Amino acid sequence: MEQKLYLVHLGYYDPELSGGVYESHVNLFFIGTDFEDVRDKAKADLLVQKHKMHIDGIQLIEKVNGHKIIVDKKDGDETQIQNHNFRELSKK
């Protein structure tokens, strides 16, 4: 089956932030074949389990600004992400 890119919006209550009264959120990317597959992968994720996160929503990302997203499996299981903070971007 074809693998696709999904964004999973997760909520959790962190006792270190305001005593856990307010819900915090994080978005994580997963690769999967369908929504159920991605749901299961998200629930099995160690970070999700550690913080007792729950799934608020899942988005399938197929096209962005006219560009089709193609998932191409490479060797290894690592995730590679490049991050740039506001200060780095505002210098340009």
Task: Name these PLM-found stretches.
Residues M1-H25:
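Short aromatic-glycine-(Arg/Gly/Cys) micro-motifs in beta-strand/loop hairpins
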Residues Y13-P15, T33-F35, K63:
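Generic structural motif
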Residues S18-G57:
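Extended intrinsically disordered, low-complexity coil regions enriched in Ser, Thr, Gly, Ala
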Residues V48-K92:
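Short, mixed-charge low-complexity intrinsically disordered segments
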